[in-house]
């Protein structure tokens, strides 16, 4: 298996790039999150890769971070999700945004990704629950309401609020807020609504 590729970036045609490694050019498909952070053509590039071997082709997918690659691998384990759809998910949202959507069970966020319908989004949420964990790093940079969003959500649901109301209230809770403080802030937001 090819786990990493380092060389000179020769071409950039989204979502495919061409990387020269000692005279051999490798075509690598990358998510748009990786594509936008690539160096200019002619410069050195290092990518973590995932090789997919099919009956008719050997396809190489590249990622700048270990979190992107491990998320790609988790997506491939889901029934009905192939490499193209997994790449589309990572192109349409960051790993942190996907992790947040799974934590909050936000199917609407996933359906904004081209090619993901309601049923597929629900299947992704169901099968990814509890799998996007510590190896994906913190949700920093995402619009994450809180590190304890799931606990806060469950508390609000137990208090009788609808999921829609609870999710709207949680979005106002800053990252790093504890559960009890997050519940207080959410209840304050709900009382103003």
From Swiss-Prot:
Residues 65-139 are annotated as: Domain II. Gene3D superfamilies: 5' to 3' exonuclease, C-terminal subdomain, DNA helicase RuvA subunit, C-terminal domain, Nucleic acid-binding proteins. The keyword Zinc does not apply. It comes from the Bacteria. SUPFAM superfamilies: DNA helicase RuvA subunit, C-terminal domain (SSF46929), Nucleic acid-binding proteins (SSF50249), RuvA domain 2-like (SSF47781). Signal peptide: none annotated. Residues 1-64 are annotated as: Domain I. Residues 144-193 are annotated as: Domain III. One of its GO terms (cellular component) is Holliday junction resolvase complex. One of its GO terms (biological process) is DNA recombination. Keywords: Cytoplasm, DNA damage, DNA recombination, DNA repair, DNA-binding. One of its GO terms (molecular function) is ATP binding. It is found in: Cytoplasm. Residues 139-143 are annotated as: Flexible linker. Homotetramer. Forms an RuvA(8)-RuvB(12)-Holliday junction (HJ) complex. HJ DNA is sandwiched between 2 RuvA tetramers; dsDNA enters through RuvA and exits via RuvB. An RuvB hexamer assembles on each DNA strand where it exits the tetramer. Each RuvB hexamer is contacted by two RuvA subunits (via domain III) on 2 adjacent RuvB subunits; this complex drives branch migration. In the full resolvosome a probable DNA-RuvA(4)-RuvB(12)-RuvC(2) complex forms which resolves the HJ. The RuvA-RuvB-RuvC complex processes Holliday junction (HJ) DNA during genetic recombination and DNA repair, while the RuvA-RuvB complex plays an important role in the rescue of blocked DNA replication forks via replication fork reversal (RFR). RuvA specifically binds to HJ cruciform DNA, conferring on it an open structure. The RuvB hexamer acts as an ATP-dependent pump, pulling dsDNA into and through the RuvAB complex. HJ branch migration allows RuvC to scan DNA until it finds its consensus sequence, where it cleaves and resolves the cruciform DNA. Belongs to the RuvA family. Has three domains with a flexible linker between the domains II and III and assumes an 'L' shape. Domain III is highly mobile and contacts RuvB. This is Holliday junction branch migration complex subunit RuvA. It comes from Burkholderia thailandensis (strain ATCC 700388 / DSM 13276 / CCUG 48851 / CIP 106301 / E264). The lineage of its organism: Bacteria, Pseudomonadati, Pseudomonadota, Betaproteobacteria, Burkholderiales.
């Amino acid at each position: 298996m090819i786990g990493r590729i380092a060389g000179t970036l020769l071409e950039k045609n989204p979502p495919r790039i061409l990387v020269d490694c000692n005279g051999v050019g490798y075509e690598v498909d990358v998510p748009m999150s990786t594509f936008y952070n690539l160096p200019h053509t002619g410069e050195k590039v290092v990518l973590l890769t995932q090789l997919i071997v099919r009956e008719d082709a050997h396809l190489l997918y590249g990622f700048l971070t270990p979190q992107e690659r491990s998320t790609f691998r988790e997506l491939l384990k889901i029934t009905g999700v192939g490499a193209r759809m997994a790449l589309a998910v990572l192109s349409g949202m960051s790993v942190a945004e996907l992790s947040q959507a799974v934590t909050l069970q936000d199917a609407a966020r996933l359906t904004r990704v081209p090619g993901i319908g309601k049923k597929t989004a629900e299947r992704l949420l169901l099968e990814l629950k509890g799998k996007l964990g510590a190896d994906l790093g913190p949700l920093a940079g995402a619009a994450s309401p809180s590190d304890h969003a799931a606990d806060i959500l469950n508390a609000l649901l137990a208090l009788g609020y609808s999921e829609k109301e609870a999710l709207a209230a949680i979005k106002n809770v800053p990252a790093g807020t504890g559960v009890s403080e997050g519940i207080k802030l959410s209840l304050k937001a709900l009382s103003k609504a």
